[in-house]
């Protein structure tokens, strides 16, 4: 309650509020409908997203792989992803694919490894803890696509980085995600915590290279037009200039 009180007071006394997408704007509007809220989308530095090494060679991966990048946390949907990958391997019998999970532990690591062992997927799933930034960047470029099966996100950056390499994204139709990952435009959205839906989406992209290319290109164009650091800086500067001009005219 105390936190909500201060958030409300800050919003009420702000000249303007920057929201990363329509979902965030709706949240702020619910707190104070009279606030000036401008959408300034998150942007990535495209110049920094350049692969400098051979990821597969470094980690001795001899097959295609799909990628997860994020915290080892329950809310990131890793459990759902592992169960979906189990369906891919053991029910759908897609054998020439591996899953790479990259990130840092947020309390779920031991449970994650336990589930991988329980499902006998230790040889099929590669977990890279505390990966160097260069390794993450090279992984984007060599992956087939990214999977972000989160239970919730506000405005995730990881899909934008994947788009920069023309890699589509499978994610969930939850909270702010659909404003970044657009279903059947630059990725595929499924319901959160639904391993069957997720496995079907994974299989769909694995079996259709033309669709992967189409969605990946759309994501690439989205980042270059709207979600890069230059656009973000220009839009932020314009907002500051508008605030200064309005204050001078008062």
Q: Which residues fall in each region the model found?
A:
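Conserved donor-binding/catalytic core segment of Leloir-type glycosyltransferases
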Residues: 60-76, 82-85, 100
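Aromatic "clamp/platform" in nucleotide-sugar-dependent glycosyltransferases that forms part
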Residues: 151
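Conserved acidic donor-binding segment of nucleotide-sugar-dependent glycosyltransferases
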Residues: 183-184, 188-195, 204-210
